[in-house]
């Protein structure tokens, strides 16, 4: 009887390699999008001095920008690939020596609590100033057209003109992982929010798609800028 050779079962590493090869043909692969958006935010002075990071989910894999690198020079090959448990599936390609972002535990927490597909962390000057001019643990703003670009999670719709957007502010800590406990509390206490501000540090923003996260980031930045200028003018 002739032996029938069984096809070889693909290993997880083979699947990762096959999927990663797609980035050379797919401009919306996380390996391409993360460097592109990092360069954009660098040009807006939100990711200078190696600060900030972006993470995106693609199927069951999570792509994370490395830490301590010049964000405007990131390349597709520089990304870490991890799973939902934080296990490293793939290191940066071409033998590059990079460090996993300190934001990774917070990215994983946001994915777990919100089911997001993209998380942006930046050291935006507008976000920092917004936390300084806000005396309490919240940033509040209303009656501006750009509020309509912010997603209201519990009602599965965007905010309407005239509604008030409330963003929680948590206190900064010596390291990013130490922010996790207060980040979780803020997300639980403010179920509508897609943003958490960190006093004198920056912000985390997330969305169900990378497009939503990026658009909301831009809307939040606009709202922070208006609030800062109103404060300078002595207006509410």
From Swiss-Prot:
One of its GO terms (cellular component) is cytoplasm. The keyword Cytoplasm applies. Signal peptide: none annotated. Zn(2+) binds at residues 121, 123, 201. It catalyses: 5-(methylsulfanyl)-D-ribulose 1-phosphate = 5-methylsulfanyl-2,3-dioxopentyl phosphate + H2O. Substrate binds at residue 103. Residues 1-29 are annotated as: Disordered. Catalyzes the dehydration of methylthioribulose-1-phosphate (MTRu-1-P) into 2,3-diketo-5-methylthiopentyl-1-phosphate (DK-MTP-1-P). Belongs to the aldolase class II family. MtnB subfamily. This is Probable methylthioribulose-1-phosphate dehydratase. The lineage of its organism: Eukaryota, Metazoa, Placozoa, Uniplacotomia, Trichoplacea.
